[in-house]
Amino acid sequence: MGRMLTEARQRVQDALQWLWQQEGTPGQRARGLAAGIFCGCFPIFGFQTLLGIALASVVRGNHLLAAAGTWISNPFTYVPLYWFNFRVGSLVLGPGRPWPGFDAVRQEGFSDVGWSVLTRLLLGSTITGAVCAALGWWLSVRWLQRAGS
C-alpha cells in the first residue's frame, strides 16, 4: 500500500512538472494560467476551458496552462465558489430581492427573479475571477522565475 502511494505521488509530481515546463516564457505561462483561472470563476459549465484557451490566445498565454487553470472550479468547488461569487455580487449591487419560493417564481415569472440572481452572480464572478487571476499570475511568475525556467 505504501509503495502504491509513493508511486502515485511521484506520477502526480511528474505530471505537474511536465505541465509547468511547457513552452513559453514565464510571463506567457503565467498569463495562460491567469486566463484559465479567470474563466474558471464563471458559471459557464462546459465552456470554461474553451473560453480560457480563447482568452489565453488574446493575451498570448500558454493554452495548456489556461485549460488547467479553469479547474479552479470543479465538482467539489462549484457550490462554494458560486455561492461566494453571488455574495460578492450582492455586496456590490445590494442584496436585491430575497430568494423566491416556488409561488413567487410562478406568479412573477422566472426571468424576473433569475435576472436579479444572475447579475449578482456574474458581477461577483468577474470580481473574484479578476482578483484570483491577478494573484495566480503574480505567484506563478515569481515561482517560474525563481525556478529559472
What does each model-found stretch correspond to?
Residues 21-39:
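Small-residue-enriched transmembrane helix starts and helix-helix packing motifs
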Residues 34, 38, 68-72, 123, ...:
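Hydrophobic residues within alpha-helical transmembrane segments
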Residues 79-105:
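Juxtamembrane non-transmembrane "cap" segments at the membrane-aqueous interface
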Residues 89-97, 139, 143-148:
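Membrane-interfacial segments
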Residues 97-119:
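Short, membrane-exposed interhelical loops at transmembrane-helix boundaries
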Residues 122-145:
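Transmembrane alpha-helical segments in integral membrane proteins
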